[in-house]
Swiss-Prot record:
GO terms for molecular function: transmembrane transporter activity. One of its GO terms (cellular component) is plasma membrane. This is MFS-type transporter prhG. Belongs to the major facilitator superfamily. TCR/Tet family. MFS-type transporter; part of the gene cluster that mediates the biosynthesis of paraherquonin, a meroterpenoid with a unique, highly congested hexacyclic molecular architecture. The chain crosses the membrane at residues 84-104, 121-141, 151-171, 182-202, 212-232, 240-260, 285-305, 315-335, 352-372, 390-410, 419-439, 445-465, 479-499, 555-575. It is a multi-pass membrane protein.
Amino acid sequence: MITESREHLQSKPQNSESIIRLDTPDDRPSLECDSLPSGGHSSKVSGGPASIEGKDVKNVSELETCATKAQTPHDEVPISTSKIIAVVGGLVLAVFCMSLDSTILSTAIPNIVSQFHSQNEMGWYVSAYSLTLASFSLAFGKIYTFYSTKTVFLITLSLFEAGSLICGAAPNSLALIIGRAIAGIGGTGMYLGALLLVAEILPFDKIPITTALLGAMYGIAAVVGPLLGGAFTDYATWRWCFYINLPMGGLTFLFVFFFVKRGKDKKRTREANNIVARFLELDPIGVALMIPTLVCLLLALEWGGATYSWHSWRLIVLYVVGGCCALGFVGVQIWRQDTATIPPRLLKNRNILGIILFSFCLNGSFVVLAYYLPIWFQSIKGVTAIKSGIMNLPLILTMIICSMICSTLVTKLGYYTPFLYLAPIIASTGAGLLSTMHVNSGSPVWIGFQALFGIGLGCGGTLSIVAAQTALPPEDISTGTAIVTFTQTLAAAVFNFVAQNVFQNQVLSGLAQSAPGVSAAKLTKAGPTMLREVVPADTLPAVLEVYNTAITRAFYVSVGGAALAIFGSIPLQWLSVKDRKTQAVTAHA
């Protein structure tokens, strides 16, 4: 808060020496500002409520100039345009690799199982990666809060590369699972670091379009992953599903290492006088409770009703352990307050609460369609897995194009809130129309409905990260970004679980009524692409109707998620990315 009015400031003599100081809590950074336009007088600036000493300030804009420099440490070390392009290109490659690892194994797993004779372990080839990807996201948010973004990013990139190398060279199933877990830990830190590096090296009004570019990698990987996995498996070896990460990750490492200057560790950590004190800054108790909480939750969602009964002792153990750890985690966060993994004060920020709800619902809505649309194409239209990926392109391409357009508009206009209002309205309409599809729906129907949902998703999918970063002061950006990315990952697990239960229950009840002679277990084992091979011709139409109904009922989950996302948009303030630096100063007033 500036303690003198504009009129009073302008009434000061313009030739006198002055000092401008923005006072802050002890753990906030400060710097000397000696480049005021009014005669080059020396000033001291630190972020926080302002007081003014001396006799000369030409106008308030001079104060804002100093404040801007204090609040944007990355502006102190400018990077050339060519280096920025190289670094952003490297970050895009890294995020693409991380996203690719979530989808590329879908067509390679049968060959891996055949080579390792590991039918009972194949579920862990996917789960080991997704579990660690979700479980460590908040922990890395805490680490990035205290340590150099460049340093932590390079470490997590190295972890991801090491995990990929272990997977590619795995002599047995256990080694592959361990490699996948290591890659997941590195991947979540690498993705978060990419978002934070973008926020550090770019002007804030250029961040939306770059974030959209990173987010587009998820959509591209969803389509390209199965195609690459199938190509590597058929024409080379499944091991190249992992080796492909090494050259791309290596290029990213070189760009970031040489072109991004290492920032200083945060002040609070620098003041810690020993290793133990630094370690305690990272909330180790909270992290130790959070990780088993998430692992228990995700395992329960994955195993429940599919691998084990909901009442089995394994699931009960997960409920008890997960519940106790969750209660302990909440207690630790309340106790540690500002040094917690999730500082409670952030959850009092209406923008953050809104973005959490918005991201959870909209991303969950997308995940359901991304999973069940290919099943609809394979089972109802009888196409191959690769062809179903191509038929899914209308959603992915419109999402990418609309995301880039909206991000460009945000860069020009400054405001992102209107797009976050539009996103759930358009997306829920598109998902609702997809839920009306039937067995004989033609290409104009499924292309148009997918495109409509893709437009809605593109309007708001990546802007949620930008909204969180705009609404938070610089010292909270890493934590806020981690919360949003964690929310998106958790949404994928929760919404898939709900949709899977809707789908399975509808298939069971539908077969019992329309095709009682067909075994649901037999259909599940065969998979959607083999539906016509295992079902007698005389009962195939009835089974297709059952499958179509089950899939479109699962789409209802997507409709509900997209519609609920509007309640996350409503609390958002109208903040501009163009005023981000000034808002960072006044946010503490």
